[in-house]
């Protein structure tokens, strides 16, 4: 059996309806922007396999650094312990994160980062003895595939099978040009009528919704409304962070 046939015997793939989807391509190696399959056919990885766009495949600098670290310390529990690489990374990240950030909590990926942020928002008020259990999100938002992240997402393609199981999320319109006041009014109304813990948003651009853009000034207005009403804000920069909008973070605008 070739690689694809062996794969199909055991594996389910994400975002795939296996009854109708084309068979996956069996890739055996990559270098920079190129991939090669098991027949040595060359492909341009035009989507950077989602996650390697800053550095390409098989980056020798990264490979050498990983090898060096593995020969020193491959893992230590982060509860009750710390280590040089994580402290150094945090020190470097604080130099580029927006200036209002003070602490870092590490997670596995974008979805679980959103999951943690939502849990922190809810537990913040729980710890204070304040009943706030609603999260505010934009219409047609996408925040990930774990449960709270799906709850905050507004695209039914990803969430319809799980409706009725989610935390309480209320949606407001995106403040696109000409509809800013509608968004402001909706946010104010939700805050006045619900016990809102947090507002999660994709800053300046909604990717999965179809690259829906809105202005920094509109986001600033929404954030001010939240701050005035003791509602925490969560900037989901999984798609926009680290230079993808021009500045290091979209929240820097």
Model-derived features: positions:
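Conserved N-terminal phosphate-binding loop of PLP-dependent enzymes in the Aspartate aminotransferase
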Residues: 1-253
């Amino acid at each position: 059996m070739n690689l694809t046939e062996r794969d199909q015997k055991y594996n389910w793939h994400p975002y795939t309806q296996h009854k109708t989807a084309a068979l996956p391509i069996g890739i055996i190696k990559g270098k920079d922007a190129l991939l090669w399959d098991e027949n040595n056919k060359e492909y341009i990885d035009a989507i950077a396999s989602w996650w390697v766009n800053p550095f390409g495949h098989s980056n020798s600098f990264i490979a050498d650094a990983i090898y060096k670290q593995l020969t020193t310390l491959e893992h230590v529990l982060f509860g009750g312990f710390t280590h040089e690489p994580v402290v150094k990374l945090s020190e470097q990240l604080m130099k580029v994160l927006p200036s209002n950030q003070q602490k870092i909590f590490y997670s596995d990926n974008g979805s679980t980062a959103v999951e943690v942020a939502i849990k922190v928002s809810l537990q913040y008020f729980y710890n204070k003895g304040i009943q706030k259990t609603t999260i505010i999100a934009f219409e047609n938002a996408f925040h990930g595939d774990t449960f709270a992240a799906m709850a905050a997402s507004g695209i039914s393609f990803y969430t319809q099978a799980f409706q009725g199981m989610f935390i309480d999320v209320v949606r407001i319109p995106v403040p696109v040009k000409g509809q800013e006041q509608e968004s402001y009014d909706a946010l104010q109304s939700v805050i006045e009528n619900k016990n809102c813990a947090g507002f999660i948003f994709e800053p300046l651009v909604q990717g999965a919704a179809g690259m829906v853009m809105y202005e920094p000034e509109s986001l600033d207005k929404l954030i001010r409304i939240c701050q005035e009403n003791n509602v925490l804000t969560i900037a989901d920069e999984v798609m926009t962070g680290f230079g993808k909008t021009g500045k290091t973070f979209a929240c820097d605008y």
